[in-house]
Structure formats: C-alpha cells, structure tokens
C-alpha cells in the first residue's frame, strides 16, 4: 500500500498518514534515525489519482470517438493510458483504504489488510510492466513506420495491434500474480530491475537508430529537388517518433528514482546514505503518479487531432470536423 510493488510486509504499522497499510520490506523503518522522512498528505495521492483517472479516460474516449485516431499507435497510447490509470487509481484507492483503517468506525483483521495490500501491490506491478511493454510496442511501431514505410500498413495492422495489446495485458496479469506469490523473495526486485534496464536499453537502441536514419534522410532530401509528399510524410513519421521519445523521457525521469530505490535495497540495505534515500519512498510514488498525469498532456500537446477531439468532448463543439 503506497508501497513498492510485490515486496514483503513485515509489520502492520503506519509511520505517518500517507504511508502504507503495512510497512514494506524496502521502506526501511530505521531510516528515520539518519534523515527525516518527507510527509506527504493523503490528499496529494487522492488528487493525483483523480486527475490521472479523468485525463486518461478522456484520452481513451477521444481515440474511440474519432475515427481518424483508429491507428495502431493511438491504440497503443490507449493501452498506455489504461496502465497510467491503474497505478494512479491503485494509489488513490489505497489512500482511501488508509483513511478507513485509521477511522474509529471500522476495524479490520490483519489478514484482510494483507490481502488488500497484495491487491494494490499487484496493480502497481501490472501497471509498471504494462507501461514498459506499451512503450516498447510504440517504439517498434514507429521503427516500422520509418524503416518500412511502404509496407507499414501490411506489417502493422489494427488487428495485429489489438492482438498485441491483449497479449501484453495477459502477460502483465500473469506477472502481477507471480510477483505477489513470490513476494518474499528478493528475486522479485532483481527481476523488476533487470526488466526495466533491459527494456530501456532496447528502446534506446531503437530510437538512436531512428534518429540517425532521420538525420541522414534529411540530408539526402535537402540535396534533391522538392517532391510533394516525401518531406511531409517523413516529417509526420518523425513527429510521432519525437512524441514517443518525450513519453519515454518522462517515464524514465518519473520511474528512475523508484528503481534506484530498489537497487539500493539490494546492494546496500544497511548503508546510512542508502537508508536515507529509501526513506523518501512516498516521494517516488508521487513522481510515478505525476507520470500518469503528464502523459495525457503530452498527447494533447503533440497531436492536433487529439487536441481537437478533447475540445469536442469537453465543450460539445459539434461543428468541428473530425473527418
């Protein structure tokens, strides 16, 4: 609960109002001896969860409503929006659960609290794996768009994209269950860290290759006479690649402190400086939730079509041409 996913809880204590229902293994309760923990009000988690939920629902509604957005990339963005919703909703519900546990009106057995903790931890784990897999799928989609432009519509069809999305979520569901079943093992943390860095390396390689190709292509186009359709098409492909690169950068920025937290738990659990860093776990959770809030803003900023659809849904502008 407001804890890192899938790791064992050792005691049913609550260090402060924004902490976990059960103190996770890596929350390092002794950290207060070395540095002061940052108190984050429960309202922050709840507010971020609600904003993220509304924003990502808007993204999904926009893609469903606008036929021009029925393409593999936007379907992958919808899947990423669901992953963003999952992590924010889990933390918001967790905050509500903490408030209920702290109230004098209801009491719960420790076993029930442990079950709820496992459910919310599983949701966070599933969201993490889903986010990484969807970002990778989008990277592959942009890669195919740039390097196999003439065959793109036969290689990456809507049906194939939807099948891949279903496969991603089935895999994520299995991972969530496995992480909970083996939550007592440190191998869970090792697997999460390994997956994160392996996926980041793979996506980084794809994007470096794409932008090197784009740079070479721009030089070649500049040396040729103007040809209608060539430059605009390439510009459109690269604009999509830039958008996903921004998404990836924000994802790394928001999730990196969490993964550094996991790395320190494995490598130096008793070092005072490591303990001090891990004392601020709730801050890293807030960053993760901020990622879920920022992503829809990036979609809107980078896509005029999506932005217009948002405006139509929110304002009811019937005169807008959505093609």
Swiss-Prot record:
Membrane topology, from the record: Multi-pass membrane protein
Coiled coil residues, start to end: none
Extracellular side: 1-37, 101-118, 182-186, 269-277
Stored CDD domains: 7tmA_MC3R (cd15352)
Disulfide bonds: none
Tissue: Brain, placental, and gut tissues.
Covalent lipid sites (S-palmitoyl cysteine): 315
A cellular-component GO term for this protein: plasma membrane
InterPro entries cross-referenced by the UniProt entry: GPCR_Rhodpsn, GPCR_Rhodpsn_7TM, MC3-5R, Mcort_3_rcpt, Melcrt_ACTH_rcpt
Known glycosylation sites: 2, 16, 28
Keywords assigned by UniProt, alphabetized: Biological rhythms, Cell membrane, G-protein coupled receptor, Glycoprotein, Lipoprotein, Membrane, Palmitate, Receptor, Transducer, Transmembrane, Transmembrane helix
GO terms for biological process, alphabetical: adenylate cyclase-activating G protein-coupled receptor signaling pathway; circadian regulation of gene expression; G protein-coupled receptor signaling pathway, coupled to cyclic nucleotide second messenger; homoiothermy; locomotor rhythm; phospholipase C-activating G protein-coupled receptor signaling pathway; regulation of blood pressure; regulation of feeding behavior
Record's signal peptide: none
Gene3D superfamilies: Rhodopsin 7-helix transmembrane proteins (1.20.1070.10)
Homology family: Belongs to the G-protein coupled receptor 1 family.
Record-given protein name: Melanocortin receptor 3
Upper taxonomic lineage: Eukaryota, Metazoa, Chordata, Craniata, Vertebrata
């Amino acid at each position: 609960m407001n804890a890192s996913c899938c790791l064992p809880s050792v005691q049913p204590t609550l260090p402060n109002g924004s902490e976990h229902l059960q103190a996770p293994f890596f929350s390092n309760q002794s950290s207060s001896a070395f540095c002061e923990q940052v108190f984050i009000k429960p309202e922050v988690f709840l507010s971020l969860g609600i904003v993220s939920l509304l924003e990502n629902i808007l993204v999904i509604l926009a893609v469903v409503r606008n036929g021009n957005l029925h393409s593999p990339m936007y379907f992958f963005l919808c899947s990423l929006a669901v992953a963003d919703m999952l992590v924010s909703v889990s933390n918001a519900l967790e905050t509500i659960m903490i408030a209920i546990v702290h109230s004098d009106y209801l009491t719960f057995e420790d076993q029930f609290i442990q079950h709820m903790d496992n459910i919310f931890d599983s949701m966070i784990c599933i969201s993490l794996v889903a986010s990484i897999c969807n970002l990778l799928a989008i990277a592959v989609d942009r890669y195919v768009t740039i390097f196999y432009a003439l065959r793109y519509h036969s290689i990456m069809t809507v049906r194939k994209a939807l099948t891949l999305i279903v496969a991603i979520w089935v895999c994520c569901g299995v991972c969530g269950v496995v992480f909970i079943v083996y939550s007592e093992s440190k191998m869970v943390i090792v697997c999460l860290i390994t997956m994160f860095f392996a996926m980041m390396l793979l996506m980084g390689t794809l994007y470096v290759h794409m932008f090197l190709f784009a740079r070479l292509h721009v030089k070649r186009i500049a040396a040729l006479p103007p040809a209608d359709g060539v430059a605009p098409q390439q510009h459109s492909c690269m604009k999509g690649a830039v958008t996903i690169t921004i998404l990836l950068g924000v994802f790394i920025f928001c999730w990196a402190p969490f993964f550094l937290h996991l790395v320190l738990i494995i490598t130096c659990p008793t070092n005072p400086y490591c303990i001090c860093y891990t004392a601020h776990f709730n801050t890293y959770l807030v960053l993760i939730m901020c990622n879920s809030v920022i992503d829809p803003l990036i979609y809107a900023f980078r896509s005029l079509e999506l932005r217009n659809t948002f405006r139509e849904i929110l304002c009811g502008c019937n005169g807008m041409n959505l093609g």
